[in-house]
């Protein structure tokens, strides 16, 4: 209400306005604001769910692999324990069989010790605490030493073991000579174990522009292509001739981890009925080592 002059007096003027449209606009703005808030909250929840899922996925995968690893390890440990228990029971019943049963128990204990060592190595690798030395390694000496170590075993199994290296010295690499020897030991042990008598295993090497390529080839039954894709998986063993009580399916996994620690690559280069070839490539430092 407003007062306005009118002659000698005053008059009141009242202005009326319909605010229904304004109220409608206010409610529309409130609704739009509430919708935007709800949409923002929904988007925030979706983003949190997405990022949380991505963050949790590696943890879930790690837990799944750990559960599978423990289950497989338990299964592998159960086998030698069963043999030891059976041998111990038989020893109580028939003492005359003591020498044979004692050897059986000793062999199974040795198997368990190897398995535990392998499990500890992989556990250190998973924890990121597995380290290797960083020193110059004479590849020629490493190959010769490894071949000489396996030559008696090859002869015992009726196999030929060949060492093929170039006439000139191979370049030296940096790493842990003991661990590199362990990789070659795994490859040669597999090759000698799965190659039938009369076959041949070859340990070879060649120099590449920036690397040294080591090769282990055998004339065994080969690895089916379906199995080759999983050959480095832990506890994986093909259901073919490449299966042995002496092997737990961990050797190649350990060799792969050691290769990674040396910044190299390990792969199955060739498989088939004519045999299998594993190739280990190690980088050569740009500056020559002495």
Short names for language-model regions:
Residues 1-31:
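Extracytoplasmic
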Residues 107-115:
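Short alpha-helical segment of the dimerization/phosphotransfer core of two-component systems
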Residues 127-132, 172-175:
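Conserved micro-motifs of the catalytic ATP-binding
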Residues 153-164:
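Short conserved segments within the C-terminal catalytic ATPase subdomain
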């Amino acid at each position: 209400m407003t007062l306005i002059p009118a002659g000698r007096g005053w008059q009141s003027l009242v202005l009326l306005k319909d605010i229904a449209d304004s109220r409608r606009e206010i409610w529309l703005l409130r609704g739009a604001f509430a919708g935007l808030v709800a949409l923002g909250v929904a988007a925030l929840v979706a983003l949190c769910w997405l990022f949380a899922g991505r963050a949790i996925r590696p943890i879930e995968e790690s837990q799944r692999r750990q559960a599978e690893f423990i289950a497989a390890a338990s299964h592998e440990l159960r086998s030698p324990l069963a043999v030891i228990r059976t041998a111990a029971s038989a020893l109580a019943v028939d003492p005359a069989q003591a020498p044979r049963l004692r050897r059986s128990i000793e062999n199974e204990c040795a198997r368990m010790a190897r398995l535990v060592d392998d499990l500890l190595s992989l556990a250190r690798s998973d924890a990121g605490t597995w380290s290797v030395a960083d020193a110059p390694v004479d590849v020629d000496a490493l190959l010769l030493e490894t071949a000489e170590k396996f030559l008696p075993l090859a002869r015992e199994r009726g196999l030929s073991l060949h060492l093929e290296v170039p006439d000139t010295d191979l370049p030296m690499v940096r790493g842990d000579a003991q661990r590199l020897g362990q990789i070659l030991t795994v490859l040669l042990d597999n090759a000698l174990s799965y190659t039938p008598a009369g076959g041949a295993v070859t340990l070879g090497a060649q120099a590449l522009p920036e690397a040294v390529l080591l090769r282990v080839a055998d004339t065994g039954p080969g690895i089916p292509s379906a199995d080759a894709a999983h050959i480095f998986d832990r506890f994986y063993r093909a259901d073919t001739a490449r299966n042995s009580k002496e092997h737990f399916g961990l050797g190649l996994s350990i060799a792969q981890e050691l290769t990674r620690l040396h910044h190299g690559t390990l792969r199955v280069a060739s498989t088939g009925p004519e045999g299998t070839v594993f190739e280990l490539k190690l980088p050569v430092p740009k500056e020559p080592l002495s």
